[in-house]
Structure formats: C-alpha cells, structure tokens
C-alpha cells in the first residue's frame, strides 16, 4: 500500500504542451519494490515530460481531437474509473490514478504488489484508494481558502516539505496536509501520550463549538405527462470545536420538527465513535413510509482541531421549494418563452438572493427582446445569449410570478456563443439560483441545548443554517428533455 | 571546486528535475552526487537549501548513486553528516535519516555486510525506542518527531526486506504499550508482525517468544537477517486475500499452521492491542492497519476474525474511501466468518449508497461503482475476476445508479455497464412497477446518438456514443430486442453525419459478427442508396471499403460508377480503388470488370489509373481464390506499415513466384523399353499438399532435345501418386544430367519455385530394342547387323565379370529385352538400338565361372568407351 510517484499538472489549453508539471514527487524505495513485485510486467515511472504528454492524451486534454485516433477514440477503449493505463514508449504504465479539478490534474501511480499480467482487479489493489485519498488531500490543501494564483503558488511551494511529513516514503500517513503543516510549525510542542495522530496539538482558549448546517436542493422539473419531477436535499453538517484537553468528547444531536423530512444516506466523519443502527440503515433506496426514523440523530465524536464535516445526509422533502414551468416555442425567426414560478407556502420567503438564469445555447447573440414580467427585473447578456431574471429577496404575496416574451437571435458564431450537446433545437432549461439564510428545507436543526460536551469549561455553542440551490433545473415542457431513470417512476 | 551558492544549487536542481536523464548525460551529471554530499556539510548553505538537496536525493538516488557501493558510500556520508550536526535543534536530522534510509534501501546496499546498514539500524531502533543516545545527539524538542521518523524509516526497511524486524516484535509491542507515538509504532508493529507470520509459516516455524521477548536495542541487535534470507528477498503482497489476485501463486497461502496456545494468546493480545488504539490513527493509517492485520490473520487457526467487528461497526458509517476499501478487503479475506448474510447486505447497501452520494466527488463514485460490480460476495455465483452485479443488488437498489445523458462520459459508461447487466437479467426478473430497463437503455442510446450527430460537436461525444454501443453489443449479445434498434439507430446516425465513418469502421472491427454482419448490410444500403456525389463522398467510400461484399453488387457498382465521375483528387480516387479492391476480394467479377476498365482510362491521376489497370489485370487473369490471397492482408508486412506498402508487399507475396525449399521429391523408376523413344519413369512424392505442380527439366550440354514439362494437378503426402513418364529425345547416345525445377501452388495460395536435386540419365536408360525379327530369322538378322558395323564403326572385346548368378542371371536382369539369339546358358547375341540412330551389338559366348568374354561392335565409335564401362559395371550393379 504505497505510491510510486505523484504529480500535479496544470491544464493550460491553447499552449503548445497544453499543460505544465507544477509538482512531482517520486518514491524510489517503492519503485524498487514495484520492480520486484511486477517482475516481467514492470514498467518504470517515466520522467515528467513523457508522463505529461501521455496523460493529457489519455484524458483528451490535448487541443487536437480533429482526427480519429484509434489509441484514443476506439470504441473498445472504455474507462469506467479515474484509473488509466498510459502508453509511454511502447509500454503501458498502469494503474495511473488521475482526475481533473479546477484546471489542475492530480495524478499518482499506486504500487501493485503482484504481477500486472494479467491485470489484477482494481478492487484488490490497496494503493488505489490510498492514491485517491492522497490526491484529494492535496486538492483540499491547495484550494481550502485559496483565492488567487499567488496563494496557489505559495501552497505549491509548501508541498515538498509537507509531503516529507505526510508521505515521506510513499505510504500516506495523513491525508490532511494541513495537519502536517501545523505539525511542522509546532514541532516543539511536547505531545503527551495517546495523542491521536489526526490531532497535532491541543487547543488553549475559550471553549466554543460551532455547528453549521448547509442544505443544497437540486431539482429537475419537466411539467410533463409521464415524467415525474424530481428533487433532493443534500445536507452537510460542519463543525469547529475549540475545546481544551486531548480527547474531549462531544455529542451533537440533529433534530427535526414534527413535520420534518427524515434524514437519509447519512455518512459520518471517521471521528464519530458510534452510530445508531437506525442512522446507518436509513436510506433513500428504500421506499419511504411513516415508520422512517426521524431522529434525533445523535453523533458522539472526538473532534479534531480543524473545522470538519461531521456528516452528510440526503432527504426527500414532500414538495420542491419552487415549482415552475418553462415553455419555449420556436416561431419563425424568434423564440416565444413563458415562465411561471411558484414558491411553496411552507418555505421561508426571505431570500438572500433569487435568480433564474435562462441560457440559449447553440444560437447567435440576442438581437431583440420583448418581454413582460409580473415581478423582478430582467438582465440581458446579448453576447452570451443569456437572460437573468432577478427575483430579489421576496416573492410577492401571491407567491407566484411569471415572465413571458419573445427573443430574436443573430447569426451564430462558434467562438462566442456557448455550445451545448443537450440543448439543441427546442430542448432548453432555466436554472434557479437562490439562497435562504437561517433555514433548512428538511427543518433539520442542531439544538444548542442538546449538544453535550465532556470537557473542562462550559463552551459557547453557536449554530447556523442555510439553504442554497444547486442544479435546480426547469426544462422546456414543449420539447424533449434528458430524463433520469428516477423520473420514469410514476 | 568550492561549495555552490544557494542560487547556483537552485538552478542546478531545477535543470536536473526538468530532465534527470538529460542532466546526468551532460557535463555536470557525474559530479552531482558527490557535490551534493559534500555541500551538505558546507557552512555557507542554509538549512533550507540543504533540505532541498536531501529531498532530491530522496527522489533520485538511483541517478545520483547508481550502484550498491556508491549507495553505501552515500549513506555513510549522510550518517557522518548527521553525527556531526551540532547539538542544537536542526531541520536536517529528519531528512538526513530519511535520505540515508532511502539511499540504502533503493540502492540495494542494505544487508548484514554493509557498514552503513550496521550503523543506521541500531540508530533507528534506538531513536524509535526513545533511548538516550548520549552526547546530546537528539535535542529534547526533536525527540518526539525523530522517534516517529525512525519508526517510518524502519517500516520502509522492513517493507523492502521483509522479516528484518522479526526479532524486534516484543520490543515494539512494549513501546506501543508505553508512551511511544501510537501511529508510527502501530503501523511498524503490524507490518513486522504480518511479515514474520508469513515467513515463519513458510519455514514451518512458530512465533516462539518473539512477541514477548524484549531485546535490548543496544545489545547485539535484534536484526534477523536469517529470516530475511529465508524470505529469499521475496516481497509479500499485501492483497493476496483477494481471491482473483491469488490465482497462479499456489504456495502463497498461510498454511493453516497451528500456534501453541501460548503463542496464539500472545498473537491475539497483540492484534487486540493494535485494534483497540486504532481510532487514534488517521483514517488512511487505520485502513493500512486493517489491510495488514487482515492479511496477517487470514488462515490462522484459533484467531477468529470477529476481533475486527468492533472496528467495522465504528467505520461502516463513514464514506472514507480507504476505510471502506479496507473493509472490502476484510470481507474478501474472511467472507462469512466475519460478515453474516445481513452484514453483507448492509455493506453492499452502504457501498451502493456511497457510489451515488451527492456529497462525494465523482472519482469516488466511480471507484465505489467498480467495487459494487466486483463485490466480494460470501457465495459468489459468476466467474471470478469479471465484473458482475452481485446477487443482492436488485433493480430497486440500482435505481439511483443508472445512467443519464447528463452524466460525464466515464460515469455514463460505468453506469451503462450496470444497466446492461440489469437488462441481461431482466427476463428472469418479475415485471414489477419499475419501468423497463431495456426501454430506458434504448432511449439513452438514442440520446447519445443524437448528440453524436450534432454538426460541429466535439469528437468526444461521438466517441462516447460508439463506446456505449460497443459496451451494449458486448454485454447484450444474443438479445435481438436490443441489437435491432441499435443497428437501426446507428444507420440513422451515419445518415446524419457521414464524417463519423472512421468510428463505424472501428466499431465493425471490434464487435462480434452478431452485430457486425447485420450492421454491415444496413450501412451498405445507406451508402449505396445515395447519389454518390455529395461532399461526404470520401466518408462513403471509406465506409463502403469496409462494408462492401458480394451481396447487392449492382447497387454498389452503380454507386461507384456514379461516384467515379466525382473522384477528382488523389484521395477520393484512392478511396474508390479501395472499394474496388474490397469487391475484388469478395469475389465480385461481372460489372467490376467494366468499372475497372473505365477507371483505368478515366481517372485523372496516373497512380490511380495504374492501380485500376492492375486490378483489372488481376481480375482478368487470376482465379477467385488466388485473387483473394493476392489482395488479402499481407503476412509479410508489419502491421503498422502504411496501406500502400502493405498492398505492395501483399502483391509481391501473392503474385510473384517465391523461391522456396522443395516440398516435392522425385525418384527415378525403372525405364520403359517400348516405343520409339527411351522414356524415364519418375516417382513424385510431396511433403505438404501442393497443387498445379509443374516439373521442368533442362539437359546439361544439349545432349538431348529440350524436354517437355510435366504437370501434376495435385499431390498430397501419404497418397500414392501415379508415376510420371518423361520421354527423352537424345541427340547423341550419351548419359546426361537433368536439372529439375518445380513450380507449384501451396494450400495458402502462394506460388513457389524450388530447385530439386538433379536426375542422372544412365547409358542403359537410352537402350531400345530392335524390332523383333521373324521366328528363326534371329541369327541371320543379327549377323547382318554385326557385319554392317564395319568398316565405319568400331570393334572391341571386353571381359565382363560375372557374379554368383552366372551369365544367365546377368542377361535376364539387364539385357533380356535386347536378346536376339539365345543359347542358354552359354551364348547370347544382343542387339541394342541407341537413339537417335546408333547400334550396339554384343556377343556373349563361352562363359567361364567368373566372367564372360564379350565381343562388341558399334557403328558409333563414341559409344565404345560407354559400352565398355557399362559391361564392366554390370556385375557390380546387380
């Protein structure tokens, strides 16, 4: 269970190489083991240059995909995981764990402790999950709180020293690189015994516990016979516990109001020490019934120093917060659109913001627009072929608003207007963006009185909640729309 | 050279990292390793720079110190540098330990005879034990971090030399129980324990007191090089618990060796000790611990895997990739012994849930989905090593894992695979209220094709569509309800976007005939029904070259005829000719002749005309099987050569006559003495089946008239062939050598040419009898001949030795057909006609026991020496 090498590569489309190796680290002792384990099937880790080229080709990130290239485009080359075989100098380097996120490619080569011919199943290679965790750890470190390029460069320059702590020999010791940074900074602190490895020091100061619940709601609405609208809530509970002592114990309970929607698919942080079996088994896979466990959801844990995600959950609320329809028809040279949105009465009518984005793909710039709206203002981005309906902080008393109008487009030019493979012809969507503070759709809240802390001093407990939209689509009901299998379940 | 400045080093390291091989090949390469070691002691360089030098040495020791002795020297130097550090806190101690360990382990210098190893190992163990190493070697503030580092170094050495720390198990256990740093010690102990158990079981030994003996690290040292040697340097895989990974390594399993009750108790206590404190480890370290202990305990009697249960209950709620993966490893290792049927169902549910949980990143989803399809079931039904839906994974559970057009390509393909597996099982499933997966699959594929058909869309969309079609064709072969609409849809896609022709050709190459054949038919119909002059002509021709065959000839030829007028450039003409070639191969003749003739006249490009003419000639002259071979893929050309080269090579192989070793043997039978000419009887024999054999003979020295070739339609080994008759037309009565050439076709259709060993025509082979004189007139006839020889001819007397068979035997064996007058057993008169018009007359009279005097006359004096030799050789020739 070790990594032979790790790379960070920035993806730079339009440049000659289409990318630059920003960081790489090799582990020669692991490489030596790979040579013994893999035997005749051993393929050495290449230098950065060839690796970069082969990886970008495999990930289809080179600019040139004009022609059919069999080694890339053949129908039988099917990758179903983020684990690749790279052709380098006539040999295939496998397995290479790699993914692209925010224009940065994260890649590593886990050690396989046996021959590679025939290829062992991925699930049997312990280094694969470790490789993912390693790359996720680096990604979290680079992008936590990072705002601009110079901060990114600073963090990249810290990586060599951090990996000397977190992964000195290719076997990952801690995926949380921030821990290693703190460890380097506070190396002189004498650690008492039984200090957890995931907690590099102890907190000194006023005890406080902060709990914030963020719910994201996503939805696909079709307004069609035979296709069900779908929506889902995904919650994240984040905690920051500033408590004295090596191993303070905390229990947080999440509660629901009487008509709240049960939490399902709960995943917890590894610091949670035990879980009620009702929490473990409550799942969205099963059909819902009244007997579903509805809390309180108790999470006993020993907190790490940093802010962490105590748990994730999903929930199926009975109605979507905003129900709408979108009708778009092509009429000779123009499009006629009609939009209707209705806020459900049970939802808190106090938004931080609420907007409907109405994009028109695969068309030219907007040249003419006539519209009528019952509420809010419309902003027009002619070159981007985009309308934004700014609804504001509150829906009107009727809770229902509408927009109708006609749009005319100029000639299409490929560079400026967005291409979309799905929104062709009259297939189109509008996407809602909104945020409501101090509110959750499930009703889920962390009762401050139910937070139990077994540590010296009475901590100050603060709790926050918010609801935000994410992938909230309303499809044109007058044209075909992509459906999920779930939408066919009527 | 003095020490380099910080900037000079930064520049040098940058140049090295850009391309280590290029740097090492350059002028500075040789000195880099030496300079690095010496500058580590320079007082002018900052610690930060020195750390970067050490970091480099940790990454590229093989380049800096390419052999074991150089690595040994480097490790010694690094240790010296460590010892020489002033007794104050320094950022160098940790990296120096790491670098020395790396140099020894990666350089292959680690061993009982290595001085550096014998210094490093006690130092590391001393640091790990937190013992006082004297002289302020370790400042108090660094003690704790160095203790952890020493454990990491020891773990790496143990990884590279399994069994090295077998003697230190007791010590490590003791340290873990006291105040040592939990994570490094736990991982080190678990690894050493695993390796020791594996090695001990292999040599049939027990743990003995290893887990309890506390060796003093300052003593002789607990290094167990013997155990390392017994391990034969062979590294132990961590994941053999996986059934599929285990195949082919028979002697791997830990033979269920029984430990003594004492040993078993200690082992159990050690494992429990490790597991109980595992919550103090980081999640990734916990996962490692579980993998190691799972492997250590697998197959050990008396060690119930239930020890793991408390940890599993704690971890089942997390979605940490490494932890869930480790749990699956335990599942694979212990099966039902650790996971009851209910546990199994719960684990699969958690896994299914994690594979779609919106809070997790897409790469995690994909890996979990792979884990679902490779789930180590307690009672697996299907073949091992193949992805399949576990039995417990019903349609209800999969609902959220099905693909939609909104997924990215990888997620779509992974989920599509699952959907295909569901469709394959659908027939057995009861039709519930769920919508039909097969119908959903059809819709999805239609959506993918629609996107691929978008004008100007990226190639990735097309590739995805064809990958999906291929996946479906593989998983659902034999399901016409799926394949029929797929074929129909693909044909429509081609109609919409002919530029996808290369993808179609690739798909046809990859899929089984079940999809390929009907798809070919449909695509051919789509192409030939077009007018043959649109802008996509080059794609149509590419497609047609793949799908054209003997069926629907006239439509295809009509299309080509129409297209020919529009093939104005080289590319198109080549495309057109490729289709002709495909038709030629498929055995199309009729209309193709006309087309090729037209092309040979009409095409603008001379190369095109030449090719058309060549194809025409081939078509006109070669039989269908030969044509197939001539145009078939060439065996001679390597696969990557261009098609033109391949074509030429193919022609060379197929149309030229190949020099080959002789596959046929000829032997000379007894000659026939009838008719006006001497005739040789040849017996052919084949080593392999050969066809259309033509034997050509050439007479050396033009002694005979040129010989006709002999033809044999077919020869097979083991099947007796009729003898071949070769009439000779001598120009003078003399023996001769015949050169023999064979020309034949092999069963693969190649025409070969071979030299056979020469045949020798003997003097006697030319003998012909004179016409038989009337009864009783023999003597007169003979005397007349005898007298006619002189005076132009020659006369001689020869002693012909006789063998045991006597004169009678000799005559009956060799001269019987030529005897004119016989008075057995003493006197014979022999008259031989030698074509073209010579005669040889022999009187054999008054034979003695050992010989007979022969009086001979001939009208051709040149025959005399030949006759003499012949007679003298007769006795020996018996």
UniProtKB/Swiss-Prot annotation, chain A:
An example Gene Ontology biological process: vesicle-mediated transport
Membrane topology: Peripheral membrane protein
Keyword hit for Protein transport: yes
Expression by tissue: Expressed in various tumor cell lines including Jurkat, Hep-G2 and HeLa.
Subcellular location: Cytoplasm, Cytosol; Late endosome membrane; Lysosome membrane
Entry keywords, A to Z: Cytoplasm, Endosome, Lysosome, Membrane, Protein transport, Transport
GO cellular component: AP-5 adaptor complex; AP-type membrane coat adaptor complex; cytosol; late endosome; late endosome membrane; lysosomal membrane; lysosome; membrane
Any Pfam family hit: Adap_comp_sub
Domain MHD span(s) in chain numbering: 206-476
Domain of life: Eukaryota
Coiled coil, from the record: none
Family designation: Belongs to the adaptor complexes medium subunit family.
Function of the protein: As part of AP-5, a probable fifth adaptor protein complex it may be involved in endosomal transport. According to PubMed:18395520, it may play a role in cell death.
Subunit structure: Probably part of the adaptor protein complex 5 (AP-5) a tetramer composed of AP5B1, AP5M1, AP5S1 and AP5Z1.
Identification of the protein by name: AP-5 complex subunit mu-1
From Swiss-Prot, chain B:
Cell wall biogenesis/degradation listed as a keyword: no
Gene (name only): AP5B1
Organism of this sequence: Homo sapiens (Human)
Subunit organization: Probably part of the adaptor protein complex 5 (AP-5), a tetramer composed of AP5B1, AP5M1, AP5S1 and AP5Z1. Interacts with ZFYVE26 and SPG11.
Function recorded in the entry: As part of AP-5, a probable fifth adaptor protein complex it may be involved in endosomal transport.
SS bond partners: none
Span list, region Disordered: 234-260
Pfam families attached to this UniProt entry: AP5B1_barrel, AP5B1_C, AP5B1_middle, AP5B1_N
GO cellular component entries: AP-5 adaptor complex; AP-type membrane coat adaptor complex; late endosome; lysosomal membrane
GO biological process terms on file: endosomal transport; protein transport; vesicle-mediated transport
Biased amino acid composition, Basic and acidic residues: 250-260
Top-level taxon of origin: Eukaryota
InterPro entries, per database record: AP5B1 (IPR038741), AP5B1_barrel (IPR048980), AP5B1_C (IPR048981), AP5B1_middle (IPR048979), AP5B1_N (IPR048978)
Record keywords: Protein transport, Transport
UniProt name for this protein: AP-5 complex subunit beta-1
Organism taxonomic ancestry: Eukaryota, Metazoa, Chordata, Craniata, Vertebrata
């Amino acid at each position: 269970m070790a990594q032979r090498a790790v790379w960070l590569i920035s993806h730079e489309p339009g440049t000659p190489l289409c990318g630059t190796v920003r960081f790489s680290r090799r582990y020669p002792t692991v490489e030596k083991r790979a040579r013994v384990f893999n035997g005749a099937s051993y393929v050495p880790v290449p230098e950065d240059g060839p690796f970069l080229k082969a990886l970008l080709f495999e990930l289809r990130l080179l600019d040139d995909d004009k022609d059919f290239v069999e080694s890339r485009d053949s129908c039988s080359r099917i990758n179903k995981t983020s684990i690749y075989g790279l052709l380098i100098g006539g040999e295939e380097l496998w397995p290479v764990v790699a993914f692209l996120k925010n224009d940065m490619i994260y890649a590593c080569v886990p050690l396989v402790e046996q021959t590679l011919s025939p290829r062992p199943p991925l699930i049997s290679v312990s280094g694969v999950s470790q490789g993912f965790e390693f790359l996720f750890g680096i990604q979290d470190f680079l992008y936590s709180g990072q705002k601009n390029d110079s901060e990114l460069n600073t963090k990249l320059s810290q990586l060599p020293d951090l990996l000397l702590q977190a992964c000195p020999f290719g076997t990952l010791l801690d995926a949380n690189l921030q821990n290693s940074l703190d460890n380097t900074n506070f190396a002189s602190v004498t650690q008492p015994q039984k200090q957890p490895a995931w907690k590099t020091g102890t907190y000194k100061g006023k005890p406080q516990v902060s709990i914030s619940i963020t719910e994201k709601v996503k939805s696909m609405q079709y307004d069609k016979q035979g296709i069900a609208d779908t929506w889902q809530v995904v919650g994240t509970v984040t905690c920051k516990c500033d408590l004295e002592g090596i191993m303070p114990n905390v229990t947080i309970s999440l509660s629901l109001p009487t008509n709240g929607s049960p939490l399902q698919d709960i995943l917890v942080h590894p610091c949670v020490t035990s879980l009620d079996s009702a929490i473990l088994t409550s799942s969205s896979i099963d059909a819902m019934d009244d007997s579903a466990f509805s809390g309180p959801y108790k999470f006993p844990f020993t907190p790490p120093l940093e802010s962490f995600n105590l748990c994730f959950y999903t929930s199926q609320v009975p109605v979507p917060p905003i129900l709408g329809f979108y009708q778009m028809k092509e009429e000779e040279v123009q499009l006629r659109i009609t939009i209707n949105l209705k806020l459900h009465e049970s939802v808190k009518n106090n938004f931080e913001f609420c907007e409907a984005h109405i994009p028109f793909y695969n068309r030219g710039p907007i040249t003419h627009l006539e519209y009528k709206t019952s509420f809010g203002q419309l902003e027009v981005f002619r070159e981007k072929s985009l309308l934004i309906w700014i609804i504001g902080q509150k829906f009107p008393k009727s809770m229902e608003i509408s927009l109708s109008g006609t749009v005319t487009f100029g000639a299409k030019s490929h560079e400026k207007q967005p291409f979309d493979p799905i929104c062709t012809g009259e297939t189109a969507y509008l996407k809602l963006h909104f945020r409501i503070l101090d509110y959750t759709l499930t009703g889920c809240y962390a009762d401050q009185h139910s937070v139990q802390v077994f540590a010296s001093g009475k901590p100050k407990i603060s709790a926050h909640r918010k609801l935000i939209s994410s992938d909230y689509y309303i499809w044109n009901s007058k044209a075909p729309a992509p459906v999920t299998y779930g939408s066919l379940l009527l | 050279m003095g020490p380099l400045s910080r900037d000079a080093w930064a520049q040098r390291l940058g140049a090295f990292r850009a391309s280590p091989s290029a740097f090492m090949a350059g002028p500075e390469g040789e000195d880099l390793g030496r300079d690095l070691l010496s500058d580590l002691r320079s007082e002018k360089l900052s610690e930060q720079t020195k750390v970067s030098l050490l970091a480099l040495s940790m990454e590229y020791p093989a380049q800096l110190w390419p052999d074991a002795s150089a690595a040994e020297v480097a490790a010694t130097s690094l240790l010296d540098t460590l010892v020489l550090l002033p007794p104050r806190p320094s950022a160098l101690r940790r990296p120096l330990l790491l670098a020395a360990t790396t140099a020894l382990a990666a350089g292959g210098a680690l061993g009982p005879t290595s001085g550096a190893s014998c210094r490093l190992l006690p130092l590391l163990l001393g640091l790990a034990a937190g013992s006082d190493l004297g002289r302020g070697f370790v400042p108090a503030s660094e003690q704790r971090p160095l203790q952890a580092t020493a454990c990491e170094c020891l773990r790496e050495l143990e990884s590279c030399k399994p069994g090295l720390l077998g003697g230190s198990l007791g010590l490590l256990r003791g340290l873990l129980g006291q105040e040592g740093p939990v994570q490094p010690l736990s991982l080190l102990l678990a690894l050493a324990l695993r390796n020791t158990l594996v090695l001990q079981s292999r040599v049939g030994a027990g743990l003995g007191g290893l887990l309890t003996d506390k060796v003093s690290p300052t003593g002789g040292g607990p290094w167990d090089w013997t155990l390392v040697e017994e391990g034969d340097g062979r590294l132990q895989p961590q994941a053999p618990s996986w059934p599929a990974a285990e195949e082919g390594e028979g002697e791997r399993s830990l033979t269920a060796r029984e430990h003594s009750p004492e040993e078993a108790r200690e082992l159990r206590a050690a494992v429990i000790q490790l597991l109980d404190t595992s919550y103090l480890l980081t999640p990734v370290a916990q996962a490692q611990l579980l993998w190691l202990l799972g492997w250590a305990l697998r197959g050990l009697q008396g060690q119930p895997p239930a020890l793991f249960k408390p940890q599993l209950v704690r971890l089942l709620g997390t979605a940490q990739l490494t932890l869930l993966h480790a749990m699956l490893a335990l599942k694979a290792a212990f099966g039902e012994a650790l996971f009851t049927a209910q546990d199994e169902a719960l684990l699969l549910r958690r896994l299914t849930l994690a594979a779609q949980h919106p809070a997790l990143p897409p790469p995690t989803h994909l890996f979990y989905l792979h884990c679902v399809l490779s789930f180590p079931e307690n009672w697996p039904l299907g073949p091992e090593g193949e992805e399949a839906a576990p039995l417990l994974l019903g349609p209800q559970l999969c609902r959220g894992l099905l693909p939609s057009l909104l997924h990215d390509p990888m997620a779509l393909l992974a989920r599509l695979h699952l959907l295909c597996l569901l469709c394959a099982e659908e027939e057995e499933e009861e039709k519930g209220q769920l919508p039909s997966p097969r119908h959903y699959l059809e819709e999805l594929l239609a959506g993918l094709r629609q996107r691929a058909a978008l004008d100007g869309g990226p190639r990735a969309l097309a590739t995805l569509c064809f990958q999906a079609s291929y996946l479906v064709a593989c998983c659902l072969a034999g399901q016409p309800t799926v394949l029929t609409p797929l074929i129909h849809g693909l044909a429509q896609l081609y109609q919409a976007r002919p530029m996808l022709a290369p993808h179609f050709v690739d798909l046809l190459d990859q899929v089984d005939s079940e999809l390929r054949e009907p798809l070919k038919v449909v695509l051919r119909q789509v192409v030939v029904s077009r007018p043959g002059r649109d802008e996509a002509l080059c794609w149509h021709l590419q497609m047609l070259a793949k799908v054209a065959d003997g069926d629907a000839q006239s439509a295809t030829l009509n299309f080509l005829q129409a297209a020919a007028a529009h093939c104005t450039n080289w590319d198109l003409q080549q495309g057109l000719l490729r289709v002709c070639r495909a038709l030629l191969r498929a055995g199309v003749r009729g209309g193709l002749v006309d087309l090729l003739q037209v092309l040979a006249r009409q095409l603008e490009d001379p190369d095109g005309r030449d090719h058309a003419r060549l194809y025409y000639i081939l078509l006109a002259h070669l039989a269908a099987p030969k044509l197939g071979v001539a145009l078939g893929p060439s065996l001679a050309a390597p696969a990557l050569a261009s098609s033109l080269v391949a074509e030429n090579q193919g022609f060379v192989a197929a149309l030229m006559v190949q020099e080959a070793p002789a596959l046929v043997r000829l032997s000379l039978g007894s000659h026939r003495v009838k008719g006006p000419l001497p005739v040789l009887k040849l017996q052919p024999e084949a080593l392999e089946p050969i066809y259309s054999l033509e034997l050509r003979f050439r007479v050396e020295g033009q002694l005979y008239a040129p010989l006709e070739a002999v033809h044999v339609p077919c020869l097979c080994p083991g099947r007796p062939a009729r003898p071949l008759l070769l009439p000779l037309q001598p120009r003078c009565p003399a023996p001769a050598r015949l050169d023999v050439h064979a020309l034949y076709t092999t069963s693969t259709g190649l025409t070969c040419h071979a030299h056979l060993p020469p045949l020798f025509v003997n003097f006697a082979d030319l003998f012909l009898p004179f016409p038989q004189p009337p009864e009783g007139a023999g003597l007169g006839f003979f005397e007349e001949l005898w007298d006619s020889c002189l005076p132009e001819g020659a006369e001689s007397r020869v002693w012909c030795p006789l063998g045991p068979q006597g004169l009678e035997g000799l005559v009956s064996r060799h001269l019987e057909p030529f005897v004119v007058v016989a008075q057995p057993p003493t006197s014979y008169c022999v008259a031989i006609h030698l074509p073209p018009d010579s005669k040889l007359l022999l009187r054999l009279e008054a034979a003695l026991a050992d010989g007979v005097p022969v009086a001979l006359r001939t009208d051709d004096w040149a025959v005399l020496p030949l006759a003499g030799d012949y007679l003298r050789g007769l006795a020996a020739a018996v």
